[in-house]
UniProtKB/Swiss-Prot annotation:
<dbReference type="GO" id="GO:0004818">
    <property type="term" value="F:glutamate-tRNA ligase activity"/>
</dbReference>
<keyword id="KW-0067">ATP-binding</keyword>
<dbReference type="Pfam" id="PF19269">
    <property type="entry name" value="Anticodon_2"/>
</dbReference>
<keyword id="KW-0963">Cytoplasm</keyword>
<feature type="short sequence motif" description="'HIGH' region">
    <location>
        <begin position="7"/>
        <end position="17"/>
    </location>
</feature>
<dbReference type="InterPro" id="IPR020751">
    <property type="entry name" value="aa-tRNA-synth_I_codon-bd_sub2"/>
</dbReference>
<protein>
    <recommendedName>
        <fullName>Glutamate--tRNA ligase 1</fullName>
        <ecNumber>6.1.1.17</ecNumber>
    </recommendedName>
</protein>
<feature type="binding site">
    <location>
        <position position="241"/>
    </location>
    <ligand>
        <name>ATP</name>
    </ligand>
</feature>
<keyword id="KW-0436">Ligase</keyword>
<dbReference type="Pfam" id="PF00749">
    <property type="entry name" value="tRNA-synt_1c"/>
</dbReference>
<feature type="short sequence motif" description="'KMSKS' region">
    <location>
        <begin position="238"/>
        <end position="242"/>
    </location>
</feature>
<dbReference type="InterPro" id="IPR014729">
    <property type="entry name" value="Rossmann-like_a/b/a_fold"/>
</dbReference>
<dbReference type="GO" id="GO:0006424">
    <property type="term" value="P:glutamyl-tRNA aminoacylation"/>
</dbReference>
<keyword id="KW-0547">Nucleotide-binding</keyword>
<dbReference type="InterPro" id="IPR049940">
    <property type="entry name" value="GluQ/Sye"/>
</dbReference>
<dbReference type="InterPro" id="IPR004527">
    <property type="entry name" value="Glu-tRNA-ligase_bac/mito"/>
</dbReference>
<dbReference type="GO" id="GO:0000049">
    <property type="term" value="F:tRNA binding"/>
</dbReference>
C-alpha cells in the first residue's frame, strides 16, 4: 500500500487539509504501507518556499512522518513527455478561445437551459484556422478529451459505488496559455510513476476522480483505490472571532495540543466515540476506513477545546517534562486536571512561588485569617483546620470564606483545589500575602 498527501504550497494548512493528511497517514500506517508527501507547486508564481517549510513543520507537529517526498516542479520534463505522448495519441488537443469567448458560450448555454459544458469546438478547427489564431497572437490552452459515451464507475472506500456520466463534464484544461500545468495531469502522472495504490481526499474531488480515471486509462495504467471524505463544515460565527481562522498555524498559537486535534479529527465522522488520546499508536491500531460516514460533518471548536483539557489531564510527567523547566512532577500531577491550556501551568506556578498583586479585602477577615492559620508546614488538612478556626471566631458563610481566602492567596476567584494550593504556596508565603493585604488595607 502506498498513499500520498499533496498540498499546494500557496498558503498555510487548514484543518480540512490536515484532516485529510491525518486520515490518509493513519490508513497507511494501519496497513503497514508507505506514505508519500508531494508538493503540488507547478504554479511557480503562487508557490512559496515558506509555505513548504510551514507545511512540513505542521505535519511534524501533529505527528505525521513520510517515507519520501518531492516537488512537482522537479518533474516538468516528465510531464512534458507524457503530455506530448497523449497529444500524439489524440487524447489532448489545443484550444484557442479567449476567456471572454468561453464566458459568452457559458452564458448562452445557461440562457438556453443547457448545462455550461465545453462544446469541444476546438476539435473542429482546421490547421489553417489554428495558424491564423497563432498569427493573431493567441496562445493555445490544452484540454484532455473525455470519452463522453462512458459512465465512469468505481467503488469508493467511503461513499460506496459512484457513477459519473462524463457527458456532463467539460473536457478539463491540462495546460494553460502560459504553459503552466493544472492540477489534473501531473497528479495522474505522479500517481502512476510512484505506484500510488490508494488516494484519500475530500469529496470535492469526486468529479476530478472521474476525469483522472479516464486519463489513467488513456495511459494504460492501473487505477488506484479511491476514498472521498465528506467536507468539514464550520461555525463561521465562532471562527470569525479567531485570529487566523482555522489554519494549523493559528491553532498551534492558540495552544491546542497536537493530540487534542488528532483525537478529534481522527474520530470525527466515524462510528467510534470522540475521546482524548495521548498516543498516536492507539489511534492507528483502531483505524478503519470503513467506519467513516459519507454524511456531512460539523467541526466544533468547543469540542476541540474540551478535548484539549482532557488530553492534558491524561499526560504523564514524562510527556511534558521538557516543557516544564524547573517545575517538578508533583506540581504537574496536581495542576494538569485544572488547566485548559498548557501555559496555565506557568501561570499557577508563578502564583504559588512568586507572589501576587495584593487584593484589598475585609480588614477584620484578614486579621482573623492570620491569627488562626494552623502551625507547621501546610498539608492536605491545613485548609479544613483553618476554615474551622476562622468560623469559630467569626460568623461567615462557607462560600464567602473560601472566596476571601482564595482572593487573598491567589488573586483570583476560581482555580485549582485550594487545599492543595496551600501546600505549594507554603506557610511562609501565606503569612506574607496576608500581611501585605493588611498593609494595603491600612493605606486605603
Amino acid at each position: 500500500m502506498l498513499t500520498r498527501f499533496a498540498p499546494s504550497p500557496t498558503g498555510y494548512l487548514h484543518v480540512g487539509n490536515i484532516r485529510t493528511a491525518l486520515i490518509c497517514w493513519m490508513y497507511t500506517r494501519n496497513q503497514n504501507g508507505k506514505f508519500l508527501l508531494r508538493f503540488d507547486d507547478t504554479d511557480l508564481e503562487r508557490s512559496d518556499i515558506k509555505y513548504v517549510d510551514n507545511i512540513i513543520e505542521d505535519l511534524k507537529w501533529i505527528g505525521i512522518n513520510w517515507n519520501s517526498s518531492f516537488k512537482q516542479s522537479e518533474r516538468f520534463e516528465r510531464y512534458n513527455e507524457v503530455f506530448l505522448q497523449l497529444m500524439k495519441e489524440g487524447h489532448i488537443y489545443a484550444c484557442y478561445e479567449t476567456r471572454e469567448e468561453l464566458d459568452t458560450k457559458r452564458k448562452l448555454q445557461l440562457k438556453q437551459g443547457f448545462p455550461p459544458v465545453y462544446d469541444k469546438g476546438a476539435l473542429l478547427l482546421t490547421e489553417q484556422e489554428k495558424i491564423r489564431y497563432e498569427q493573431e497572437g493567441r496562445k493555445p490552452h490544452f484540454r484532455f478529451k473525455l470519452d463522453r459515451n462512458k459512465t465512469v464507475k468505481w467503488n469508493d472506500e467511503v461513499k460506496g459505488e459512484i457513477n459519473i456520466a462524463t457527458i456532463h463534464i467539460s473536457d478539463p484544461v491540462v495546460k494553460r496559455e502560459d504553459g503552466i500545468y493544472t492540477y489534473m495531469l501531473p497528479s495522474v502522472i505522479d500517481d502512476i510513476d510512484f505506484n500510488v495504490t490508494h488516494v484519500v481526499r475530500g469529496e470535492d474531488h469526486v468529479t476530478n476522480t472521474a476525469v483522472q480515471i479516464q486519463m489513467i486509462q488513456a495511459l494504460k495504467a492501473k487505477i488506484p483505490i479511491f476514498a472521498h471524505l465528506p467536507l468539514l463544515h464550520f461555525d463561521d460565527s465562532k471562527i470569525s472571532k479567531r485570529k487566523g481562522g482555522l489554519d494549523i498555524k493559528s491553532i498551534r498559537e492558540d495552544e491546542i495540543e497536537s493530540m487534542a486535534l488528532t483525537s478529534y479529527l481522527a474520530k470525527l465522522g466515524t462510528s467510534d466515540p470522540i475521546e482524548a488520546y495521548i498516543d498516536m499508536q492507539s489511534l492507528i491500531d483502531s483505524f478503519d476506513i470503513k467506519k467513516f460516514s459519507s454524511a456531512s460533518l460539523q467541526f466544533s471548536l468547543s469540542e476541540m477545546y474540551k478535548l484539549n483539557s482532557k488530553v492534558l489531564q491524561q499526560m504523564p510527567f514524562e510527556m511534558v517534562q521538557d516543557r516544564l523547566s524547573q517545575i517538578g512532577s508533583e506540581f504537574w500531577y496536581f495542576i494538569r486536571s485544572n488547566i485548559e491550556k498548557f501555559s496555565e501551568v506557568a501561570k499557577w506556578w508563578k502564583i504559588c512561588k512568586f507572589g501576587i498583586e495584593p487584593v484589598v479585602l475585609n480588614k477584620e477577615f484578614i486579621k482573623i485569617a492570620l491569627s488562626t492559620l494552623p502551625q507547621g508546614d501546610c498539608n492536605e488538612n491545613t485548609l479544613s483546620e483553618w476554615v474551622k478556626n476562622i468560623r469559630q471566631t467569626i460568623d461567615i458563610k462557607a462560600k464567602d470564606l473560601f472566596m476571601q481566602l482564595r482572593l487573598a492567596l491567589t488573586g483570583t476567584e476560581t482555580g485549582p483545589e485550594l487545599a492543595k494550593l496551600l501546600i505549594f504556596i507554603g506557610r511562609e508565603s501565606i503569612i506574607a500575602r496576608l500581611e501585605e493585604s493588611q498593609r494595603i488595607i491600612q493605606k486605603v
